[in-house]
């Protein structure tokens, strides 16, 4: 499979709705993005897709009361916004999407995100498949934003650390980029109060 074909396949997979949401978005990223280059290829471009395939997961799963939403902004990007509360042992809000099957991104060096920040630090979160099963732990890499500025952050695969329920995973297993199933954004680390992150595009780079 050549590079362009593999990227189109990856884009189609990450554009597939979770089974609970409905059927596949058939035409998402079916052609190479006009801004793609030999060194960077688009996985998700919110200027030409919706947020229907994404789901919110906040600290309510452990008794917290943080709130968040993900919606499309009129200017053509996804807006992840809400309020983080530290009450009831909470302290995080997240949004994520999952492919129908693992995506092989091993020919690239890492992920690139184009975001509109608010001065807070966010986490790009990945989950992978190992031995045919989804790992219990996730892989996380952080990026510190500048308030009111569009910026692009490149996160090498080596920047991602394995984490389970906020703790480092024993043995520090390396990220396996040839079997990525889930990807998402999170705000955590005791950053209480309102937050606002615009997401324009997610790419892979070499």
Residue ranges and their predicted role:
Residues 9-19:
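Bacterial N-terminal signal peptides
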Residues 2, 6, 19-206:
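Beta-rich carbohydrate-recognition modules and glycan-binding surfaces
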């Amino acid at each position: 499979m050549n590079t362009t074909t593999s990227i189109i396949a990856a884009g189609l997979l990450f554009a597939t709705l979770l089974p609970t949401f409905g059927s596949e978005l058939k035409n998402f990223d079916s052609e190479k993005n006009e801004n793609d280059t030999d060194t960077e290829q688009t996985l998700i471009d919110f200027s030409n897709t919706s947020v229907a395939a994404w789901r919110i997961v906040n600290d309510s799963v452990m008794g917290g009361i943080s709130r968040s939403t993900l919606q499309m902004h009129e200017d053509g990007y996804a807006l992840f916004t809400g309020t983080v509360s530290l009450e009831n042992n909470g302290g995080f809000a997240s949004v994520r999407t999952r492919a129908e099957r693992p995506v092989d991104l091993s020919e690239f060096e890492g992920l690139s995100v184009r975001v509109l920040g608010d001065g807070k630090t966010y986490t790009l979160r990945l989950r992978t498949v190992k031995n045919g099963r989804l790992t219990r732990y996730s892989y996380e890499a952080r990026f510190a934003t500048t308030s009111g500025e569009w910026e692009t952050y490149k996160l090498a695969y080596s920047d991602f650390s394995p984490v389970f329920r906020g703790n480092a995973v024993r043995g520090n297993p390396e990220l396996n980029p040839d079997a990525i199933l889930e990807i998402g954004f999170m705000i955590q680390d005791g950053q209480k109060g309102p937050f606002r992150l615009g997401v324009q595009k997610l790419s892979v780079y070499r």
